């Protein structure tokens, strides 16, 4: 186990690039080290921050507790049968690198999730999703360290209680389970998921008349994301800042009467998912800036650190967007990233 570092700068560990320090910081390179970490005098399960890629957090002030950076790596095949392969990835693996690894192995199901920032360990927490695929569609099980019993446990897909950008790990399991690895069920036979029009068009162009491959889909997703989303290494951001709101069919019908071109996605339960980026764009907020934080000029769903943004700049900008969208559409937006501490959340 690496030694604890004190007063550690967390700016490189959060993709929005907010300036903050950790009172204490330690890197976890092997899951077994968790048994030692929970016995450290600096450890308090109520205040510890389990940190992955830092792509889904907003550090609003210096972190008063212990920060554990998950750096455990490794990918291995567990089982293979009937066109299905179970593959385990450690929590510290970079998500996009893992997706590319699976595609290169001919394992299918992750390609639509290419270029999502963060680590494998974060994928079940947020139930990450893009272009018609969510993590829950491919996760077989999640291996965790249970802080209640200080033992390793395996949770099935059903145990994780996945929902849209939600999971057990954000609800009643928050603060109890530390994700150490994720097992994915991937297919050896490729069936493309091209329900989104811009993705279908991009794949058709790449495949040029031949049968498309998973690599074609992955490459197309990367091209689309790169054209719309800023690179966090160049311009700090946390990807999509707001969840796509889900409204009743009646509410959607009312909005459609006034906005017939409004994108909408009917859900199996009869509700309708709306495009948060479209709602923000209709309020003419692209490029709008408060302090050093701004709405990206090409993608309204992304807030960026344009000029050494402070935590307060980000909060004020997010609040302005929420109020403006609600005033026009009577639809409430909710932020995707986690505000730390949670008392700052809107």
Swiss-Prot record:
One of its GO terms (biological process) is regulation of cell shape. Transmembrane segments: none annotated. It is an enzyme of class 1 (oxidoreductase). One of its GO terms (cellular component) is cytosol. The keyword Cell division applies. Pathway: Cell wall biogenesis; peptidoglycan biosynthesis. It is found in: Cytoplasm. Residues 18-189 form the FAD-binding PCMH-type domain. GO terms for molecular function: FAD binding; UDP-N-acetylmuramate dehydrogenase activity. InterPro entries: FAD-bd_PCMH, FAD-bd_PCMH-like_sf, FAD-bd_PCMH_sub1, FAD-bd_PCMH_sub2, MurB, MurB_C, MurB_C_sf, Oxid_FAD_bind_N. It comes from the Bacteria. The active site is at 165, 240 (proton donor), 336. Its EC number is 1.3.1.98. PROSITE patterns: FAD_PCMH (PS51387). The keyword ATP-binding does not apply. Gene3D superfamilies: 3.30.465.10, UDP-N-acetylenolpyruvoylglucosamine reductase, C-terminal domain (3.90.78.10), Uridine Diphospho-n-acetylenolpyruvylglucosamine Reductase, domain 2 (3.30.43.10). Keywords: Cell cycle, Cell division, Cell shape, Cell wall biogenesis/degradation, Cytoplasm, FAD, Flavoprotein, NADP, Oxidoreductase, Peptidoglycan synthesis. Its cofactor is FAD. It catalyses: UDP-N-acetyl-alpha-D-muramate + NADP(+) = UDP-N-acetyl-3-O-(1-carboxyvinyl)-alpha-D-glucosamine + NADPH + H(+). Pfam families: FAD_binding_4, MurB_C. HAMAP family: MurB (MF_00037). Cell wall formation. Belongs to the MurB family. PANTHER family: UDP-N-ACETYLENOLPYRUVOYLGLUCOSAMINE REDUCTASE. This is UDP-N-acetylenolpyruvoylglucosamine reductase. It comes from Neisseria meningitidis serogroup A / serotype 4A (strain DSM 15465 / Z2491).
